[in-house]
């Protein structure tokens, strides 16, 4: 048996740097069904105590089919940490520098969400670069419920200038 080396204990064996990414590269994130438990956990973590997010009868009395997801509950599904991007960039990621979103359709308890990120921007600097993603979340009916953008600052390999 080989000796244990913690530097080789990685989800993704090869690290990627700014120049390793390409426009159009797509990162599919795990799907998730918005169960009552997910709603309750998010409501508790967010501190949003509006009954539209946790009281089924309140929602039904207002003509809604069930609990309405908080917008950030849909947005959080696009967190790159749910996929492989942060594991690919453990050595090169400097920081998360920008995020924006538009909430296009309501998300209700029982909906299954399918998030994805696609690289749509690569802006090279001297020793770093910005990787921009378009983010989308679709529901089980194929409707886009969220679209947005995320930007990350990554190091270039060995700080080499382009």
Task: Indicate residue ranges for each PLM-predicted region.
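HotDog/MaoC-like acyl-thioester-processing domains
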Residues: 1-22, 103-162
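Short, intrinsically disordered, mixed-charge
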Residues: 44-48, 80-87, 140
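A generic structural signal for short beta-strands and their flanking turns/coil linkers
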Residues: 23-25, 30, 38, 48, ...
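Catalytic strand-loop segment that frames the active site of acyl-thioester-processing enzymes
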Residues: 2-69, 156
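Hydrophobic beta-strand-centered segment that forms part of the acyl-chain substrate-binding groove
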Residues: 62-69, 73-120, 145
